[in-house]
Amino acid sequence: MNWEPSSLKTKSLPYSRQFIDEEDIEAVARALQSDWLTTGPQVEEFEKRFATDVNADYAIACSSGTAALHLLYLANNIGTGDSVIIPTMTFLATANAVRYSGAEVIFSDVDPDTGLMNASHFKDAINRSTNKKVKAICAVHLNGQCVDLSSFCEEIDKMIVFEDACHSLGAFRWSKSGQKFRVGSCSLSKATMFSTHAVKAITTGEGGIITTNDENLASRLKKLRSHGVVRDKDLGNNELINL
């Protein structure tokens, strides 16, 4: 890449310039005037529309992108004694969420031109971790660029695959056969997480969302995000937190 000053455009793209119009303000006002300030019908509508937009079966909203990552690791029983491979080029939360869960972080190198982890970097990380219990990989799609998970070696079939798409809402990739896949459709992963922080493509101020096609995982994530609270008059016990 050419980083000489003469090659850079004089007008840069704005960072953290969220666009809030009257329609947004009216929607927030309606929520404040309703009986639900959290986990209500507007959250459910947001989840349904988000899942539809990225072609996933389920979407689970939560308080932040970091919380989304943490929930994913907890819901998949990743913890002490496990390791998770992540790229070196990412926001710190990608690594911190692994540590919050008690697991160990294994860093993978990235392509210097794209900042993305590729198949050779992944294989190198695996070879450096033969004495580790590598349970998952979290591939980071950076600045709208997509990691090509389909090119990864067969070792990926032996672990849980997550996608961190905090920087890539609206991005898509093409398969070798020419088929188009939205990031978040989870065509090659168990789940994808997004952030709706103020600097992201869409914002809720703070927020995160997970997409998946796994019904059991979606149910578990919804329970974990609310301390196991389930609105069901017929449910007398909670197996998730052993009550």
Q: Language-model segments: which ranges?
A:
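N-terminal "arm"/small-domain region of PLP-dependent enzymes with the aminotransferase-like
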Residues: M1-L37, P41
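Short glycine/proline-enriched coil/turn segments at helix->beta-strand junctions
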Residues: Q33, N55-A56, E155-M159
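Phosphate-binding glycine-rich loop
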Residues: W36-S83, A97-S101, F107-D109
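Active-site phosphate/pyrophosphate- and oxyanion-stabilizing loops and adjacent acidic/basic residues
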Residues: K48, S150, F181
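PLP-dependent aminotransferase-like
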Residues: L74, I78-L142, C146-I156, I160-K176
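Active-site region of PLP-dependent enzymes
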Residues: H167-F181, L188-L243
